Design a protein with these regions (language model features):
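Low-complexity, intrinsically disordered or signal/transmembrane-proximal segments
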Residues: 2-3, 7, 13
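Cysteine-centered motifs
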Residues: 9-10, 30
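Alpha-helical and His/Cys-centered functional microenvironments
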Residues: 11, 17-18
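Short, Lys/Arg-enriched N-terminal segments with co-localized hydrophobic residues
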Residues: 18-30
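Glycine-rich, low-complexity intrinsically disordered segments
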Residues: 27-134, 138-189
Length: 189
């Protein structure tokens, strides 16, 4: 499966069949499907290129906003969202899609000296190009005819397509006693 990016949307397209089994190079069978994912919003941030972005959300208190797009651009779509302090943003790594992905990566936290499986990391080079970040919600405003969520703590490049927005719910999203592997503690800034 791969994404093809078209402006503010990502399309998931399996090869070679519409629905069935796909034989992967390693001999693993995988069910395939077709689903088009369209961006519901665009994230506006002070980070104009990927090299200045914090490695994880919440490390820097920079402010930005999520701007609703198209038919989603309606206050009813965010009715009640201000009762939450934080939100999950699901997004497309739109700047990395053309570069593809590898089964193993070298996480910066390990100094680039050790390889881990892509699913054991938060690498931006992922098989389906989907990421998630938790951000602090400050308020809902309207700007130039668009519904906007003012946020902080994001780790996204300006213009990132947002494919879903969900409330952060502390009792289920924060797991007591969870183990963080190589990222047990926040990096030192």
């Amino acid at each position: 499966m791969y994404y093809t990016a078209r402006h503010s949307c990502c399309t998931l397209q399996p090869k070679p069949s519409e629905f069935g089994l796909l034989l992967l190079p390693l001999g693993v069978f995988c069910m395939t499907f077709t689903n088009q994912i369209t961006a519901v919003a665009t994230c506006r941030t002070p980070y104009k290129q990927k090299f200045g972005i914090p490695r994880q959300p919440g490390l820097v208190e920079a402010r930005g906003y999520v701007e609703l797009e198209g038919h989603i651009n309606h206050l009813d779509a965010v009715r009640g969202i201000e009762q939450y302090s934080h939100l999950w943003l699901l997004f497309c790594f739109h700047e990395n899609l053309a570069q593809g992905w590898k089964t193993t990566v070298r996480p910066p936290r390990l100094g680039g000296n050790e390889k881990l499986g892509v699913f054991a990391t938060r690498s931006t080079f992922r098989p389906n190009g989907i990421g998630q970040s938790v951000v602090k919600l400050h308020r809902v405003v309207q700007r130039k005819g668009k519904v906007c969520l003012e946020i902080s703590g994001m780790d996204l490049v300006d213009g990132t397509p947002i494919i879903d927005i969900k409330p952060y719910i502390p009792f289920s999203d924060s797991i007591e006693g969870a183990v963080g592997g190589i990222a047990q503690e926040a990096p030192k800034l």
